[in-house]
Amino acid sequence: MQTWLLGLAIVGVTVLVAHLGLRVVRRRVPLPVLETQHEVAGFMIGVLGAIYAVLLAFVVVVVWDQFTESKTNVEKEANQLNDLSRIAQGFSPPAQQHMLDGIRSYIQAVIDDEWPTMSDGKASPRAQAAMEELWHMYREVDPQTNRENALYSEALDRLSDVSDNRRLRINASQDDIPIIVRVLLWGGGLITIAFTYFFGVKSVRSQALMTAALAGVVSFILFIVVALDNPFHGYLRVTPQPMQDVLNRIKTIPTQP
């Protein structure tokens, strides 16, 4: 199911359940009884709502920062691979072609194989093998001139950065909100919505609309939190487009004899 459909379903089901819960309470608890609890319920929902709002805002900020950081790391990795390809063009034709082939193989493995596996929080053995091959290839490079020596030093720095950012990318795909925090988020939302049942509002329709609005907002924010929790899964995900852009540029470099 597409992410936006899942989000719509979650919000719809939550609003429906909240409405049914309100109907059950209003049928079983007389209005005069609810009116006597009005002040206490109002105070409690004010306190609980404030605490829950702070917690929810904190979690949203954390997952959004993690999502943004993951996107930035992917862009850095792509930029460093682009630098590697440009540095490779400064070497002699045989070495240049060997380097470009290795870089191209690594990027292709990341796009075709590692990106799908990261949605499950896993690294790709094919991409790992391509990275190991890149390191092996650069360790075997024998610079022949002062110019190649300088370029070689820069290339090793860039390759080290690529390796580091790949590791950060994989780690980000494995980070999840702890179970205890998930329970607190969903449980807190449920309790906050349930407290709206205990207000002595004469118009059930008006109370139902207020309850539905609160349930819809809370469930939608929780859905956003879940959607952003894994930055490489779902509709709201980091794409490999920066990698694809670099790969497309490398393919335009003329093949050396």
Question: Where on the chain are the PLM-derived regions?
Answer:
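Juxtamembrane loop-helix boundary motifs flanking transmembrane segments in multi-pass membrane proteins
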Residues: 28-40, 76, 154, 158, ...
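A generic, lipid-embedded transmembrane alpha helix
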Residues: 42-59
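Short extracytoplasmic/periplasmic juxtamembrane "stem" segments immediately C-terminal to an N-terminal membrane anchor
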Residues: 73-90, 239-253
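Structured inter-helical modules in multipass membrane proteins
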Residues: 83-174
